[in-house]
Amino acid sequence: MVSSTTPSSGEYLLEMSGINKSFPGVKALDNVNLKVRPHSIHALMGENGAGKSTLLKCMFGIYQKDSGTILFQGKEIDFHSAKEALENGISMVHQELNLVLQRSVMDNMWLGRYPTKGMFVDQDKMYRETKAIFDELDIDIDPRARVGTLSVSQMQMIEIAKAFSYNAKIVIMDEPTSSLTEKEVNHLFTIIRKLKERGCGIVYISHKMEEIFQLCDEVTVLRDGQWIATEPLAGLTMDKIIAMMVGRSLNQRFPDKENKPGEVILEVRNLTSLRQPSIRDVSFDLHKGEILGIAGLVGAKRTDIVETLFGIREKSAGTITLHGKQINNHNANEAINHGFALVTEERRSTGIYAYLDIGFNSLISNIRNYKNKVGLLDNSRMKSDTQWVIDSMRVKTPGHRTQIGSLSGGNQQKVIIGRWLLTQPEILMLDEPTRGIDVGAKFEIYQLIAELAKKGKGIIIISSEMPELLGITDRILVMSNGLVSGIVDTKTTTQNEILRLASLHL
Protein backbone atom coordinates (compact mmCIF):
# COMPACT_ATOMS: atom_id res chain seq x y z
CA MET A 1 0.00 0.00 0.00
CA VAL A 2 1.27 3.49 -0.88
CA SER A 3 0.13 6.32 1.40
CA SER A 4 -0.19 9.90 0.21
CA THR A 5 0.94 11.27 3.57
CA THR A 6 4.31 12.35 4.92
CA PRO A 7 6.06 13.82 1.87
CA SER A 8 9.83 13.52 1.59
CA SER A 9 12.30 16.30 1.03
CA GLY A 10 12.96 14.86 -2.44
CA GLU A 11 16.63 14.25 -1.75
CA TYR A 12 16.08 10.50 -1.37
CA LEU A 13 14.22 7.91 -3.41
CA LEU A 14 13.93 5.67 -0.38
CA GLU A 15 13.98 6.53 3.33
CA MET A 16 13.71 3.80 5.95
CA SER A 17 13.72 5.36 9.42
CA GLY A 18 13.63 3.78 12.87
CA ILE A 19 12.79 0.30 11.58
CA ASN A 20 12.19 -2.30 14.30
CA LYS A 21 11.47 -5.99 13.77
CA SER A 22 11.37 -8.80 16.32
CA PHE A 23 10.93 -12.54 16.07
CA PRO A 24 10.23 -14.82 19.06
CA GLY A 25 13.20 -14.33 21.40
CA VAL A 26 15.19 -12.23 18.91
CA LYS A 27 15.26 -8.51 18.10
CA ALA A 28 16.36 -8.65 14.46
CA LEU A 29 16.25 -4.89 13.78
CA ASP A 30 16.68 -2.18 16.38
CA ASN A 31 15.94 1.36 15.15
CA VAL A 32 17.63 0.86 11.75
CA ASN A 33 17.91 3.55 9.05
CA LEU A 34 18.60 3.31 5.32
CA LYS A 35 18.40 6.23 2.87
CA VAL A 36 19.04 5.79 -0.85
CA ARG A 37 19.44 8.63 -3.35
CA PRO A 38 18.47 8.55 -7.03
CA HIS A 39 21.38 8.12 -9.45
CA SER A 40 23.38 6.29 -6.76
CA ILE A 41 24.71 2.86 -5.81
CA HIS A 42 24.39 2.33 -2.07
CA ALA A 43 26.27 -0.52 -0.38
CA LEU A 44 24.52 -2.27 2.51
CA MET A 45 27.14 -4.05 4.58
CA GLY A 46 27.39 -6.12 7.73
CA GLU A 47 28.36 -9.57 8.87
CA ASN A 48 25.96 -12.45 8.34
CA GLY A 49 23.20 -12.01 10.91
CA ALA A 50 23.63 -8.22 11.04
CA GLY A 51 20.06 -7.67 9.80
CA LYS A 52 20.59 -6.83 6.11
CA SER A 53 18.17 -9.44 4.75
CA THR A 54 15.53 -8.69 7.38
CA LEU A 55 15.66 -4.97 6.58
CA LEU A 56 15.27 -5.56 2.86
CA LYS A 57 12.44 -8.04 3.41
CA CYS A 58 10.63 -5.35 5.41
CA MET A 59 11.10 -2.98 2.47
CA PHE A 60 10.00 -5.60 -0.04
CA GLY A 61 6.82 -6.63 1.81
CA ILE A 62 8.00 -10.12 2.72
CA TYR A 63 8.13 -9.17 6.44
CA GLN A 64 5.97 -6.59 8.17
CA LYS A 65 7.97 -4.16 10.30
CA ASP A 66 6.93 -3.70 13.95
CA SER A 67 7.49 0.06 13.85
CA GLY A 68 9.23 2.79 11.89
CA THR A 69 8.48 4.47 8.57
CA ILE A 70 9.37 3.74 4.96
CA LEU A 71 9.09 6.54 2.41
CA PHE A 72 9.40 5.80 -1.31
CA GLN A 73 9.40 8.70 -3.78
CA GLY A 74 8.06 10.93 -1.02
CA LYS A 75 5.15 8.73 0.00
CA GLU A 76 4.82 6.39 2.93
CA ILE A 77 4.63 2.74 1.88
CA ASP A 78 3.58 -0.43 3.63
CA PHE A 79 3.78 -3.28 1.14
CA HIS A 80 2.25 -6.62 2.09
CA SER A 81 3.77 -8.72 -0.69
CA ALA A 82 6.71 -8.79 -3.07
CA LYS A 83 4.24 -8.47 -5.95
CA GLU A 84 3.02 -5.17 -4.54
CA ALA A 85 6.60 -3.92 -4.19
CA LEU A 86 7.41 -4.90 -7.78
CA GLU A 87 4.32 -3.20 -9.15
CA ASN A 88 5.28 0.00 -7.34
CA GLY A 89 8.88 0.13 -8.56
CA ILE A 90 11.01 -1.81 -6.06
CA SER A 91 12.76 -4.89 -7.42
CA MET A 92 15.16 -7.43 -5.93
CA VAL A 93 17.77 -9.58 -7.70
CA HIS A 94 18.31 -12.48 -5.31
CA GLN A 95 21.56 -14.36 -4.75
CA GLU A 96 19.60 -17.57 -5.41
CA LEU A 97 18.29 -16.96 -8.93
CA ASN A 98 14.51 -17.29 -9.33
CA LEU A 99 14.22 -18.52 -12.90
CA VAL A 100 12.33 -21.42 -14.48
CA LEU A 101 15.08 -23.37 -16.23
CA GLN A 102 12.74 -25.26 -18.58
CA ARG A 103 11.19 -22.07 -20.00
CA SER A 104 12.53 -19.54 -22.48
CA VAL A 105 14.28 -16.32 -21.52
CA MET A 106 11.33 -14.16 -22.57
CA ASP A 107 8.88 -16.43 -20.71
CA ASN A 108 10.89 -15.81 -17.55
CA MET A 109 10.99 -12.08 -18.22
CA TRP A 110 7.21 -11.75 -18.40
CA LEU A 111 6.01 -14.65 -16.25
CA GLY A 112 2.65 -13.78 -14.70
CA ARG A 113 2.20 -10.67 -16.86
CA TYR A 114 2.34 -11.94 -20.44
CA PRO A 115 1.33 -9.48 -23.18
CA THR A 116 -1.76 -10.83 -24.88
CA LYS A 117 -3.46 -10.62 -28.25
CA GLY A 118 -7.06 -11.58 -27.73
CA MET A 119 -7.11 -14.82 -25.76
CA PHE A 120 -3.52 -15.75 -26.57
CA VAL A 121 -0.05 -14.74 -25.45
CA ASP A 122 1.45 -12.24 -27.89
CA GLN A 123 4.76 -14.00 -28.55
CA ASP A 124 5.96 -11.40 -31.07
CA LYS A 125 5.39 -8.50 -28.68
CA MET A 126 7.05 -10.43 -25.85
CA TYR A 127 10.09 -11.04 -28.07
CA ARG A 128 10.27 -7.39 -29.21
CA GLU A 129 10.01 -5.97 -25.70
CA THR A 130 12.58 -8.42 -24.33
CA LYS A 131 14.97 -7.64 -27.19
CA ALA A 132 14.52 -3.88 -26.69
CA ILE A 133 15.45 -4.15 -23.00
CA PHE A 134 18.44 -6.38 -23.79
CA ASP A 135 19.65 -3.94 -26.44
CA GLU A 136 19.40 -1.02 -24.02
CA LEU A 137 21.41 -2.91 -21.39
CA ASP A 138 23.92 -4.40 -23.88
CA ILE A 139 22.82 -7.96 -23.06
CA ASP A 140 23.60 -10.41 -25.86
CA ILE A 141 21.18 -13.27 -25.17
CA ASP A 142 18.58 -14.79 -27.50
CA PRO A 143 15.15 -14.12 -25.91
CA ARG A 144 13.95 -17.49 -27.26
CA ALA A 145 16.79 -19.50 -25.67
CA ARG A 146 15.91 -21.94 -22.89
CA VAL A 147 17.19 -20.58 -19.58
CA GLY A 148 18.59 -23.98 -18.56
CA THR A 149 21.14 -23.79 -21.41
CA LEU A 150 22.63 -20.49 -20.17
CA SER A 151 25.52 -19.75 -17.83
CA VAL A 152 25.00 -18.43 -14.31
CA SER A 153 26.22 -15.00 -15.40
CA GLN A 154 23.68 -14.89 -18.25
CA MET A 155 20.93 -15.85 -15.80
CA GLN A 156 22.05 -12.99 -13.57
CA MET A 157 21.70 -10.59 -16.52
CA ILE A 158 18.15 -11.85 -17.13
CA GLU A 159 17.22 -11.18 -13.49
CA ILE A 160 18.51 -7.61 -13.81
CA ALA A 161 16.70 -7.10 -17.12
CA LYS A 162 13.54 -8.42 -15.47
CA ALA A 163 13.88 -5.80 -12.73
CA PHE A 164 14.42 -3.21 -15.46
CA SER A 165 11.19 -4.34 -17.18
CA TYR A 166 9.20 -3.33 -14.09
CA ASN A 167 10.52 0.23 -14.48
CA ALA A 168 12.04 -0.19 -11.04
CA LYS A 169 13.31 2.91 -9.26
CA ILE A 170 14.96 0.91 -6.46
CA VAL A 171 16.87 -2.26 -7.41
CA ILE A 172 18.23 -4.47 -4.63
CA MET A 173 21.16 -6.71 -5.58
CA ASP A 174 22.15 -9.47 -3.17
CA GLU A 175 25.67 -10.87 -3.81
CA PRO A 176 25.20 -10.62 -7.61
CA THR A 177 28.81 -11.52 -8.50
CA SER A 178 29.23 -14.62 -6.33
CA SER A 179 29.41 -16.96 -9.36
CA LEU A 180 30.90 -14.63 -11.99
CA THR A 181 34.32 -14.27 -13.58
CA GLU A 182 36.13 -10.93 -13.59
CA LYS A 183 35.07 -10.28 -17.20
CA GLU A 184 31.44 -11.06 -16.35
CA VAL A 185 31.65 -8.88 -13.24
CA ASN A 186 32.85 -5.95 -15.36
CA HIS A 187 29.90 -6.45 -17.74
CA LEU A 188 27.52 -6.58 -14.79
CA PHE A 189 28.98 -3.36 -13.40
CA THR A 190 28.40 -1.69 -16.78
CA ILE A 191 24.73 -2.67 -16.60
CA ILE A 192 24.42 -1.49 -12.99
CA ARG A 193 25.92 1.87 -13.94
CA LYS A 194 23.36 2.15 -16.77
CA LEU A 195 20.59 1.71 -14.20
CA LYS A 196 22.23 4.42 -12.10
CA GLU A 197 22.37 6.78 -15.10
CA ARG A 198 18.64 6.27 -15.62
CA GLY A 199 17.97 7.55 -12.11
CA CYS A 200 17.67 4.27 -10.24
CA GLY A 201 18.85 3.83 -6.69
CA ILE A 202 20.77 0.57 -6.34
CA VAL A 203 21.06 -1.17 -2.97
CA TYR A 204 24.13 -3.39 -3.34
CA ILE A 205 25.00 -6.20 -0.92
CA SER A 206 28.40 -7.85 -1.20
CA HIS A 207 31.10 -9.25 1.06
CA LYS A 208 33.72 -8.35 -1.57
CA MET A 209 35.34 -5.11 -0.43
CA GLU A 210 37.07 -4.48 -3.76
CA GLU A 211 33.67 -4.39 -5.50
CA ILE A 212 32.22 -1.96 -2.99
CA PHE A 213 35.02 0.56 -3.54
CA GLN A 214 34.96 0.07 -7.30
CA LEU A 215 31.21 0.51 -7.73
CA CYS A 216 29.41 2.21 -4.85
CA ASP A 217 28.84 5.83 -3.86
CA GLU A 218 27.70 5.44 -0.26
CA VAL A 219 27.65 2.70 2.37
CA THR A 220 25.38 1.85 5.28
CA VAL A 221 26.79 -0.55 7.88
CA LEU A 222 24.66 -2.70 10.19
CA ARG A 223 25.88 -4.71 13.16
CA ASP A 224 23.84 -7.00 15.41
CA GLY A 225 20.58 -5.59 14.07
CA GLN A 226 21.57 -1.96 14.65
CA TRP A 227 22.44 0.91 12.33
CA ILE A 228 26.11 1.83 12.78
CA ALA A 229 26.82 4.44 10.10
CA THR A 230 26.00 5.80 6.66
CA GLU A 231 28.92 7.50 4.93
CA PRO A 232 30.24 8.36 1.43
CA LEU A 233 32.71 5.74 0.20
CA ALA A 234 35.15 8.45 -0.81
CA GLY A 235 36.04 9.17 2.81
CA LEU A 236 36.43 5.58 3.97
CA THR A 237 39.08 2.88 3.95
CA MET A 238 38.60 -0.87 3.81
CA ASP A 239 39.88 -1.21 7.39
CA LYS A 240 37.40 1.41 8.64
CA ILE A 241 34.44 -0.44 7.10
CA ILE A 242 35.62 -3.77 8.50
CA ALA A 243 35.99 -2.23 11.96
CA MET A 244 32.42 -0.87 11.75
CA MET A 245 31.11 -4.26 10.63
CA VAL A 246 32.78 -6.43 13.25
CA GLY A 247 33.02 -3.92 16.11
CA ARG A 248 36.75 -4.25 16.36
CA SER A 249 39.82 -3.64 14.23
CA LEU A 250 41.03 -6.46 12.00
CA ASN A 251 44.72 -5.75 11.65
CA GLN A 252 45.08 -8.05 8.65
CA ARG A 253 42.82 -9.74 6.11
CA PHE A 254 44.90 -12.91 5.89
CA PRO A 255 46.79 -14.83 8.59
CA ASP A 256 50.57 -14.97 8.59
CA LYS A 257 51.97 -17.91 6.65
CA GLU A 258 53.72 -20.21 9.09
CA ASN A 259 53.48 -23.42 7.07
CA LYS A 260 56.66 -24.86 5.59
CA PRO A 261 55.87 -27.16 2.65
CA GLY A 262 57.75 -30.44 2.85
CA GLU A 263 58.06 -33.49 0.63
CA VAL A 264 55.74 -34.24 -2.29
CA ILE A 265 52.73 -36.26 -1.13
CA LEU A 266 50.55 -36.11 -4.27
CA GLU A 267 51.69 -36.40 -7.89
CA VAL A 268 49.19 -35.90 -10.70
CA ARG A 269 50.35 -36.63 -14.23
CA ASN A 270 48.48 -36.08 -17.52
CA LEU A 271 45.08 -36.32 -15.82
CA THR A 272 42.24 -36.29 -18.34
CA SER A 273 38.57 -36.72 -17.42
CA LEU A 274 36.18 -38.85 -19.44
CA ARG A 275 33.23 -36.48 -19.52
CA GLN A 276 33.32 -33.92 -22.34
CA PRO A 277 34.30 -31.13 -22.36
CA SER A 278 37.03 -32.30 -20.04
CA ILE A 279 40.28 -31.44 -18.33
CA ARG A 280 43.22 -32.55 -20.46
CA ASP A 281 46.77 -33.53 -19.49
CA VAL A 282 46.66 -31.87 -16.07
CA SER A 283 49.93 -32.36 -14.16
CA PHE A 284 51.05 -30.97 -10.80
CA ASP A 285 52.59 -31.90 -7.45
CA LEU A 286 51.25 -31.13 -3.99
CA HIS A 287 53.62 -30.95 -1.03
CA LYS A 288 52.99 -31.78 2.60
CA GLY A 289 51.86 -28.60 4.36
CA GLU A 290 51.37 -26.72 1.08
CA ILE A 291 48.38 -24.59 0.10
CA LEU A 292 47.98 -24.84 -3.68
CA GLY A 293 45.50 -22.48 -5.30
CA ILE A 294 43.67 -23.14 -8.55
CA ALA A 295 42.74 -20.05 -10.58
CA GLY A 296 40.90 -19.62 -13.86
CA LEU A 297 37.86 -18.11 -15.50
CA VAL A 298 34.42 -19.69 -15.31
CA GLY A 299 34.49 -22.64 -17.72
CA ALA A 300 38.21 -23.26 -17.15
CA LYS A 301 37.37 -26.66 -15.56
CA ARG A 302 38.87 -25.92 -12.16
CA THR A 303 36.19 -27.89 -10.32
CA ASP A 304 36.66 -30.81 -12.72
CA ILE A 305 40.18 -31.35 -11.34
CA VAL A 306 39.10 -31.88 -7.74
CA GLU A 307 36.01 -33.86 -8.75
CA THR A 308 38.17 -36.20 -10.83
CA LEU A 309 40.64 -36.61 -7.96
CA PHE A 310 37.70 -37.35 -5.66
CA GLY A 311 36.15 -39.98 -7.94
CA ILE A 312 33.04 -37.97 -8.82
CA ARG A 313 34.22 -37.74 -12.43
CA GLU A 314 35.80 -40.69 -14.22
CA LYS A 315 39.29 -40.22 -15.60
CA SER A 316 40.13 -41.49 -19.07
CA ALA A 317 43.90 -41.07 -18.79
CA GLY A 318 46.66 -40.05 -16.43
CA THR A 319 47.93 -41.16 -13.04
CA ILE A 320 47.38 -40.16 -9.42
CA THR A 321 50.22 -41.07 -7.06
CA LEU A 322 49.94 -40.71 -3.28
CA HIS A 323 53.12 -41.20 -1.22
CA GLY A 324 54.78 -42.91 -4.18
CA LYS A 325 51.94 -45.39 -4.68
CA GLN A 326 49.67 -45.13 -7.71
CA ILE A 327 45.97 -45.04 -6.79
CA ASN A 328 42.61 -44.86 -8.54
CA ASN A 329 39.58 -43.23 -6.95
CA HIS A 330 36.59 -44.72 -8.75
CA ASN A 331 34.12 -43.12 -6.35
CA ALA A 332 33.98 -40.86 -3.30
CA ASN A 333 34.27 -43.76 -0.84
CA GLU A 334 37.56 -44.88 -2.38
CA ALA A 335 38.80 -41.28 -2.32
CA ILE A 336 37.93 -40.96 1.38
CA ASN A 337 39.69 -44.25 2.12
CA HIS A 338 42.78 -42.91 0.33
CA GLY A 339 42.77 -39.77 2.51
CA PHE A 340 41.03 -37.25 0.22
CA ALA A 341 38.35 -34.79 1.37
CA LEU A 342 36.31 -32.35 -0.74
CA VAL A 343 34.43 -29.27 0.46
CA THR A 344 32.14 -28.59 -2.50
CA GLU A 345 31.42 -25.27 -4.18
CA GLU A 346 27.67 -25.08 -3.56
CA ARG A 347 27.40 -25.19 0.21
CA ARG A 348 23.61 -24.94 0.31
CA SER A 349 22.81 -27.58 -2.30
CA THR A 350 25.64 -30.12 -1.95
CA GLY A 351 27.37 -29.28 1.32
CA ILE A 352 24.80 -29.21 4.09
CA TYR A 353 21.56 -30.93 5.03
CA ALA A 354 19.93 -27.63 5.94
CA TYR A 355 16.99 -28.97 7.96
CA LEU A 356 19.05 -31.42 10.01
CA ASP A 357 21.16 -30.66 13.05
CA ILE A 358 24.86 -29.95 13.44
CA GLY A 359 25.46 -33.45 14.78
CA PHE A 360 24.16 -35.15 11.64
CA ASN A 361 26.01 -32.71 9.37
CA SER A 362 29.26 -33.24 11.29
CA LEU A 363 29.21 -37.03 11.14
CA ILE A 364 27.59 -38.00 7.84
CA SER A 365 30.85 -38.44 5.87
CA ASN A 366 32.23 -40.80 8.52
CA ILE A 367 29.05 -42.49 9.76
CA ARG A 368 30.21 -46.06 9.05
CA ASN A 369 33.00 -45.73 11.60
CA TYR A 370 30.58 -45.17 14.48
CA LYS A 371 29.17 -48.70 14.45
CA ASN A 372 30.15 -50.87 17.42
CA LYS A 373 30.81 -54.61 17.37
CA VAL A 374 27.12 -55.50 17.26
CA GLY A 375 26.37 -53.04 14.45
CA LEU A 376 24.77 -50.31 16.56
CA LEU A 377 25.81 -46.68 16.45
CA ASP A 378 28.04 -45.50 19.29
CA ASN A 379 26.05 -42.45 20.41
CA SER A 380 28.58 -41.43 23.05
CA ARG A 381 31.41 -41.26 20.52
CA MET A 382 29.19 -39.50 17.99
CA LYS A 383 28.31 -36.81 20.53
CA SER A 384 31.96 -36.44 21.49
CA ASP A 385 33.08 -36.01 17.86
CA THR A 386 30.31 -33.50 17.17
CA GLN A 387 31.47 -31.46 20.14
CA TRP A 388 35.04 -31.71 18.81
CA VAL A 389 33.88 -30.18 15.51
CA ILE A 390 32.09 -27.36 17.34
CA ASP A 391 35.06 -26.63 19.61
CA SER A 392 37.99 -27.09 17.23
CA MET A 393 36.31 -25.27 14.33
CA ARG A 394 35.09 -22.52 16.67
CA VAL A 395 31.49 -22.90 15.51
CA LYS A 396 29.15 -20.32 17.05
CA THR A 397 26.02 -22.29 17.98
CA PRO A 398 23.72 -22.91 20.97
CA GLY A 399 24.46 -26.63 20.74
CA HIS A 400 24.88 -29.71 18.56
CA ARG A 401 21.11 -30.13 18.14
CA THR A 402 20.81 -26.77 16.38
CA GLN A 403 19.54 -26.97 12.80
CA ILE A 404 22.53 -26.16 10.59
CA GLY A 405 20.43 -24.08 8.20
CA SER A 406 19.91 -21.54 10.98
CA LEU A 407 23.65 -20.83 11.24
CA SER A 408 25.53 -18.17 9.30
CA GLY A 409 27.37 -19.19 6.13
CA GLY A 410 30.71 -19.03 7.89
CA ASN A 411 29.61 -21.35 10.68
CA GLN A 412 28.06 -23.77 8.18
CA GLN A 413 31.37 -23.90 6.34
CA LYS A 414 33.26 -24.57 9.57
CA VAL A 415 30.99 -27.56 10.27
CA ILE A 416 31.63 -28.92 6.75
CA ILE A 417 35.41 -28.59 7.16
CA GLY A 418 35.19 -30.23 10.59
CA ARG A 419 33.12 -33.05 9.11
CA TRP A 420 35.89 -33.85 6.67
CA LEU A 421 38.62 -33.58 9.29
CA LEU A 422 36.91 -36.40 11.20
CA THR A 423 37.83 -38.65 8.25
CA GLN A 424 41.50 -37.78 8.94
CA PRO A 425 42.36 -36.71 5.38
CA GLU A 426 45.83 -36.02 4.04
CA ILE A 427 44.54 -34.06 1.06
CA LEU A 428 41.89 -31.41 1.74
CA MET A 429 40.32 -29.84 -1.36
CA LEU A 430 38.15 -26.72 -0.95
CA ASP A 431 36.09 -25.30 -3.82
CA GLU A 432 35.21 -21.61 -3.28
CA PRO A 433 35.47 -22.03 0.53
CA THR A 434 34.51 -18.44 1.45
CA ARG A 435 31.75 -17.74 -1.10
CA GLY A 436 28.91 -15.82 0.54
CA ILE A 437 30.76 -15.52 3.85
CA ASP A 438 31.27 -12.20 5.64
CA VAL A 439 34.69 -10.65 6.15
CA GLY A 440 35.09 -11.61 9.81
CA ALA A 441 34.17 -15.25 9.17
CA LYS A 442 36.45 -15.33 6.13
CA PHE A 443 39.44 -14.56 8.31
CA GLU A 444 38.46 -17.42 10.64
CA ILE A 445 38.24 -19.82 7.67
CA TYR A 446 41.67 -18.63 6.49
CA GLN A 447 43.05 -19.25 9.98
CA LEU A 448 41.67 -22.81 9.97
CA ILE A 449 43.22 -23.49 6.56
CA ALA A 450 46.58 -22.08 7.69
CA GLU A 451 46.51 -24.20 10.85
CA LEU A 452 45.76 -27.35 8.84
CA ALA A 453 48.65 -26.62 6.47
CA LYS A 454 50.93 -26.07 9.46
CA LYS A 455 49.93 -29.54 10.69
CA GLY A 456 51.08 -31.04 7.37
CA LYS A 457 47.84 -31.36 5.41
CA GLY A 458 48.12 -30.90 1.66
CA ILE A 459 45.50 -28.32 0.71
CA ILE A 460 44.03 -27.41 -2.68
CA ILE A 461 41.87 -24.28 -2.90
CA ILE A 462 39.77 -23.17 -5.87
CA SER A 463 38.77 -19.52 -5.67
CA SER A 464 37.43 -16.83 -7.99
CA GLU A 465 38.68 -14.13 -5.61
CA MET A 466 42.16 -13.12 -6.69
CA PRO A 467 43.09 -11.39 -3.39
CA GLU A 468 42.17 -14.61 -1.59
CA LEU A 469 44.46 -16.75 -3.74
CA LEU A 470 47.29 -14.24 -3.46
CA GLY A 471 46.75 -13.92 0.29
CA ILE A 472 46.74 -17.53 1.50
CA THR A 473 48.40 -19.84 -1.04
CA ASP A 474 52.00 -20.93 -1.61
CA ARG A 475 51.62 -21.62 -5.34
CA ILE A 476 48.81 -21.10 -7.86
CA LEU A 477 47.93 -23.47 -10.71
CA VAL A 478 46.17 -21.56 -13.49
CA MET A 479 43.61 -23.31 -15.72
CA SER A 480 42.47 -22.17 -19.15
CA ASN A 481 39.83 -24.09 -21.11
CA GLY A 482 40.61 -27.42 -19.45
CA LEU A 483 44.40 -27.09 -19.73
CA VAL A 484 47.07 -26.07 -17.23
CA SER A 485 48.46 -22.79 -18.54
CA GLY A 486 50.98 -22.30 -15.76
CA ILE A 487 51.94 -22.86 -12.13
CA VAL A 488 53.27 -19.75 -10.40
CA ASP A 489 54.86 -18.92 -7.05
CA THR A 490 52.44 -16.76 -5.08
CA LYS A 491 55.24 -14.61 -3.64
CA THR A 492 56.47 -13.49 -7.04
CA THR A 493 53.36 -13.53 -9.26
CA THR A 494 50.89 -10.73 -9.98
CA GLN A 495 47.19 -10.54 -10.69
CA ASN A 496 47.94 -9.50 -14.27
CA GLU A 497 50.13 -12.57 -14.83
CA ILE A 498 47.41 -14.87 -13.52
CA LEU A 499 44.76 -13.24 -15.76
CA ARG A 500 47.09 -13.54 -18.77
CA LEU A 501 47.59 -17.26 -18.09
CA ALA A 502 43.85 -17.76 -17.52
CA SER A 503 43.17 -16.43 -21.04
CA LEU A 504 45.98 -18.38 -22.74
CA HIS A 505 43.92 -21.18 -24.33
CA LEU A 506 40.65 -19.35 -25.02
From Swiss-Prot:
Signal peptide: none annotated. Pfam families: ABC_tran. It comes from the Bacteria. It is a peripheral membrane protein. It is found in: Cell inner membrane. Keywords: ATP-binding, Cell inner membrane, Cell membrane, Membrane, Nucleotide-binding, Repeat, Sugar transport, Translocase, Transport. ATP binds at residues 46-53. It is an enzyme of class 7 (translocase). Gene3D superfamilies: P-loop containing nucleotide triphosphate hydrolases. Its main location: membrane. Residues 14-249, 264-506 form the ABC transporter domain. It catalyses: D-galactose(out) + ATP + H2O = D-galactose(in) + ADP + phosphate + H(+); methyl beta-D-galactoside(out) + ATP + H2O = methyl beta-D-galactoside(in) + ADP + phosphate + H(+). Its EC number is 7.5.2.11. One of its GO terms (cellular component) is plasma membrane. Part of the ABC transporter complex MglABC involved in galactose/methyl galactoside import. Responsible for energy coupling to the transport system. This is Galactose/methyl galactoside import ATP-binding protein MglA. It comes from Shigella flexneri serotype 5b (strain 8401).
